[in-house]
Structures are given as C-alpha cells and as structure tokens.
Amino acid sequence: MKKNMSRRHFLKMGGLALAAMSVRPSLSFAAFRESETKFVSLRPSIDKRRFVSRAVEVIIKEVKPKIKDEKLRWMFENCFPNTLDTTVRYKMKNDRPDTFIITGDIDAMWLRDSSAQVWPYLPLMKDDRDLQFLIAGLINRQTECILIDPYANAFNDGPLGSYWETDHTQHMVKELHERKWEIDSLCYPIRLAYQYWTLTK
C-alpha cells in the first residue's frame, strides 16, 4: 500500500512538474517540489507530551524568528524539545525525582545517550525548577543503574529482561538491557552530574 501511495505521489508530482516546465522551462522540479512543502509542527499535542518545560517553550519562541531558513527553523522547533515531548518518564520515588529516558526507538535507557539527550537543557534549569528536578531525577536513576552494574551500558525501566539476556556474560540480570560497556558509559553520567552541580550549587 505504501509503495502504491508513493508511486502515485511520484507520478502526480512528475506530471505536474512537466506541465509547469512546458509553460515555464526555467521552473525546475526541485523548485516545484520545494514550493509544495509545508513546514508544519510535528510535535505531539500538549496533552500527549511526556513533559512540558516552560523554559524550553520560551527558548523556542525566542529563537525561531532569528532563524532565517524556513526548513532549519522547522527542524529546530521539532527537534529541540523532542526528548521532553516523546522519551521522558518522570515521577517522584521515595520523595526524590526519578527520570527514565528512552533512547527513542528502543524502550531502554542508555547511560551515554540519556546524558546527551538532556545536555542542551542544562542552562535552562535556572528558569525552570521542574526541568531541574527532571534532570536531577535522571542523575538519580543513572546512579541507581550504575550501582546495579557498573559494566552495563543500557538499562530497562525495571526488571523486564531483554533479548540480550541470554548473552554469556556474568551478572546479566533483568534490569539490564545491554551489557556492552564502553568508557563513555561512565564518563557521560559523571560529566552530567558535575555540570548539574556546577550550575545549581
């Protein structure tokens, strides 16, 4: 079905482009295609977003008018808040913030990736206490994960197991998603915790 839709769309666009070129030969297919593109927001509706940061929304409103290129402006609006919109699970656990951030396409949290995903938001914590708690919650969760296994790189949101659990490695417990340690699996959480401390002390 998808192939037919794409073929139909291609034939329609090709036919229209040829017709336009016969009227104005200088009009290229690329220019015709570009004029048809509409850069609309692809963000989830507000009620479907996993976390909403006032500071992030303010930055989007401030920065968008300064980006002249329409496509880059659209990419910024959709990409900058994407971690908060789609990948965050935030709650209070034993009176402390707890944040689990999936990598996006896999329902597991990588120590390195989750650190990098929130890094652009660190300077905004001073203007948004909820955002600060969310990042503190990630540091709490990463610490908990490292204490489960300092040689693992990716973790589940609880003892769920994974398709890697039959790997012939020691300590492949249900909380682990992968046990493929690299030095940045520890460096990124340390870097995040240090930067958080620097900005909030």
Q: Residue spans of the language-model regions?
A:
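A short N-terminal beta->alpha junction/helix N-cap motif
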Residues: K2, V40-D47, F51, V63-K71, ...
